[in-house]
């Protein structure tokens, strides 16, 4: 958040756009709280993930160790191709829909920045075969937000992408 704030200020972005960029930076990894994702980050160990003081953002696995990653993903039961960005976007969309006042930034751009921060969601996130039905919970601006999983392909994301590109 702080780095994004500095960049947004140095670029002279207007306040609503600045707010959007800062919030996207703060919230883009919310979906990593998924228990399967956390287990994967802990090398496939759900017990270590559950006992952790706070969720990990990175695994610490060597980036080139593909076999270790595949083993961790398999042990964690994280679906192949799962995207934490989809979960982050869903949590933020739920947060926005529950706000008592209108979001002070650009809600469509916010959701798109979150969904696309690893290069996907242009216009759609890839489909994932996810049989893990559960509810994902995260804290956004001090409020608990939930979203049901799995999240399917949302064609409305392509419409949003088109609207953003038409601006």
Predicted regions and their residues:
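Accessory helical-bundle/CTD segments and flexible terminal tails appended to RecA-like ATPase motors
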Residues: 1-5
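Divalent metal-dependent catalytic cores for phosphoryl transfer on phosphate-bearing substrates
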Residues: 12-167
